[in-house]
């Protein structure tokens, strides 16, 4: 059990039978009346964000989230097959369970799979990945002076904005959290 006074961003709690992660919290102590904690919580199964208020000292059950290091092997229909790095056990996970992280998955990439009650609720990718540009408009001499960007398609199918000087075949570093270009590799 976790006291509402101990809630901080990143803490996982269970509310109404679902796992939630605290995004924001504010301890409010009004001049009159009892103190309370105002929180913004993200449902880890659906991704919905809700605001909840708890009395100071109220206890909540902790959500036991299991983090497992796995390696992405291959796609098989709508399933993506991952291998547990400790037991070498293979586990198929649907693309819908992974969500938007699918666009950066590359074969043999190591990821962290988050499980709650044996059910996959999220995939944590590395913060940056190095991918090859497979499709983009050709650069024209003098493009770099303007500092503009153009769309580029990466080897995994993801599309991001890159500087005008990037060419097809170049390997670039991408931030998976913000979908932004970080630099050449």
From Swiss-Prot:
Keyword Protein biosynthesis (UniProt): yes
Highest taxon above the source species: Bacteria
Places the protein is found: Cytoplasm
Record keywords, A-Z: Cytoplasm, Elongation factor, Protein biosynthesis
Family: Belongs to the elongation factor P family.
Chain's role: Involved in peptide bond synthesis. Stimulates efficient translation and peptide-bond synthesis on native or reconstituted 70S ribosomes in vitro. Probably functions indirectly by altering the affinity of the ribosome for aminoacyl-tRNA, thus increasing their reactivity as acceptors for peptidyl transferase.
Stated name of the protein: Elongation factor P
Gene name per UniProt: efp
